[in-house]
Amino acid sequence: MSRIGKKPVPVPAGVTASVEGQTVKAKGAKGELSFVVHDEVLVKMEDGAVRVDPRDQSKEARSKWGMSRTMISNIFVGVKDGFEKKLEISGVGYRAAMQGKNLQLSLGFSHEVVYDVPAGITVAVPKPTEIVVTGIDKQQVGQVAAEIREYRGPEPYKGKGVKYAGEKIVRKEGKKK
């Protein structure tokens, strides 16, 4: 069993952190985030680091312990550097373009797919076959990337569709004559 929770989360340079009850707040160059820690976990500031401990030795408290530590670490990284996910589009005629604040996707349907980008997330299209999703909240960046990918996930025969950069698509063999 992992014991990542034992390790205190150091507050990086350029980030101010505060603990108020069960809420951890972080403010940095990219913005401000807060995370409410589960009641089964105790959280406190010690020597420029945030320490997380289980309230007792119950299974629920121990299961929330490591997750809470990682979530706090993610908000520190998010407000300092931010998070980024890249998507690649492959297929004849498949492309993406920004239309104001919305992402317009041509994915082989009879209509264009228009994705409304949520607040706090930035979507860029450096090339028509490449989408870059950035933001300070790791969960929200991953969610937006997953929603874009869901419109036309990669298919196993030709690999056409939207996939994460670096994602391996398990290919299938076609019909034999």
UniProtKB/Swiss-Prot annotation:
Alphabetized InterPro entries for the sequence: Ribosomal_uL6-like, Ribosomal_uL6-like_a/b-dom_sf, Ribosomal_uL6_a/b-dom, Ribosomal_uL6_bac-type, Ribosomal_uL6_CS
Entry-linked Pfam families: Ribosomal_L6 (PF00347)
Cysteines joined through disulfide linkages: none
Keyword line: Ribonucleoprotein, Ribosomal protein, RNA-binding, rRNA-binding
SUPFAM superfamilies registered for this protein in UniProt: Ribosomal protein L6
GO biological process, alphabetically ordered: cytoplasmic translation
GO cellular component: cytosolic large ribosomal subunit
GO molecular function terms listed in the Swiss-Prot or TrEMBL record: rRNA binding; structural constituent of ribosome
Spans traversing the lipid bilayer: none
Function as written in the Swiss-Prot or TrEMBL entry: This protein binds to the 23S rRNA, and is important in its secondary structure. It is located near the subunit interface in the base of the L7/L12 stalk, and near the tRNA binding site of the peptidyltransferase center.
PANTHER family: 60S/50S RIBOSOMAL PROTEIN L6/L9, LARGE RIBOSOMAL SUBUNIT PROTEIN UL6M
Quaternary structure annotation from Swiss-Prot or TrEMBL: Part of the 50S ribosomal subunit.
Family in the record: Belongs to the universal ribosomal protein uL6 family.
Protein's name according to its UniProt entry: Large ribosomal subunit protein uL6
Gene: rplF
